[in-house]
């Protein structure tokens, strides 16, 4: 009996040794290649991506549709919002933005309000931009040159004096050509002829012949008839401005001039 049991055990040990024998060369080569690939392959996980957190004072968004939604502060990049979701333990949602300055840029950021200080905004940047820094509006437009001041036009001097002279000239011409004025001053033109006749009359010629001293005054009396007195009886005294007046009598036929 004992001999049979020993033979059975030895048989089982032989089979187990064959099963657990040395590995074949094919299996060892396969395991080595698998370990090499696993050592050189990068770990693609979200935790390996570098993140940068920035605290910025909050700016309330005017006309916000969602309660607690905030507008991220400007950082010279163009961003486009593509999602939003609530956060556990916080009354404020989290917004997700991607860079829209250049197509295909991997830069992302998350914007949310701080739980501890609601007046602050937490901005988490992930990835980096693959394009140069965008130009600001001031550098893009450039300083505009100031417009040069336009010279003020000099005021034109109106020829007022010449116009007034022309007015007086026109008025003078009108007076000369008016027939009523011609009749009114006709006596002044006849004064030369009458004065010349008076000087040539025999009365004044006889006075030259008589010798009179320089100190004595010479008085000339002209005879005046009754008819002449009756003609001038109804007339009043002439004003002082009258220098010359003239009287003609058809009966006597004499002409008297008084200066």
Swiss-Prot record:
InterPro entries: WRKY_dom (IPR003657), WRKY_dom_sf (IPR036576), WRKY_plant (IPR044810). Residues 1-101, 126-165 are annotated as: Disordered. Residues 68-134 bind DNA. Its main location: nucleus. Residues 1-17, 47-69 have a biased composition (Basic and acidic residues). Transcription factor. Interacts specifically with the W box (5'-(T)TGAC[CT]-3'), a frequently occurring elicitor-responsive cis-acting element. This is Probable WRKY transcription factor 65. The gene is WRKY65.
